[in-house]
């Protein structure tokens, strides 16, 4: 059964108390409860998987790894936690996929993306020399006759993700990586981003790009404006419109 089928295999969402009852039964050895938890959380796993696409891995492989993280979160979830299971599970799923990519030892980027990334780098250098400043994303896109979205996505795809595994603090030989810090921060923040991912499907390409840069790359409005070649005021107005548009979808996702 492929990922697309898995995505559609969740017709109804369980209430929080139903999820916790299933977790309790699963931890007591109930295989049916365990299977139902997996089935009802497939969309959540797929939402996390989408963060790691365009790295050369098969979506279905990443989905299977994500399900391992989901199962671990079922086994380790403390029922005394005053938190939704999905909020607890997201960092576990992310961590499992990150470990898979790290242990694989390679970052697989398609040849076409690598070539486009090199073209963008050369264009950026040439435009910087001719203009006396760093070019905007739109200027690079116009120069290469491609869309601004293609510029941003290619740059992100070829950028090394190794920084997330860099040691940011070490105490008595026990290193703490950036990934550890991310997982230890507010789990609600991660779940908010996953909910947002589900809610932006109906946005146009520029709106999606603004959401991607602001909420997934934590760029400021000024940075987004520079990359898109528009003013900060325009970004602010567009963002307000976008947030208003997706509010109902996010409320539905989290209900």
From Swiss-Prot:
It comes from the Bacteria. It holds the Pfam family Sigma70_r4. InterPro entries: Cro/C1-type_HTH, RNA_pol_sigma-70_dom, RNA_pol_sigma-B/F/G, RNA_pol_sigma-F, RNA_pol_sigma70, RNA_pol_sigma70_r2, RNA_pol_sigma70_r3, RNA_pol_sigma70_r4. GO terms for biological process: DNA-templated transcription initiation; sporulation resulting in formation of a cellular spore. Keywords: DNA-binding, Sigma factor, Sporulation, Transcription, Transcription regulation. Coiled coil: none annotated. A motif (Polymerase core binding) lies at residues 61-74. Residues 221-240 bind DNA. One of its GO terms (molecular function) is DNA binding. Belongs to the sigma-70 factor family. Sigma factors are initiation factors that promote the attachment of RNA polymerase to specific initiation sites and are then released. This sigma factor is responsible for the expression of sporulation specific genes. This is RNA polymerase sigma-F factor. It comes from Bacillus licheniformis. The lineage of its organism: Bacteria, Bacillati, Bacillota, Bacilli, Bacillales. The gene is sigF.
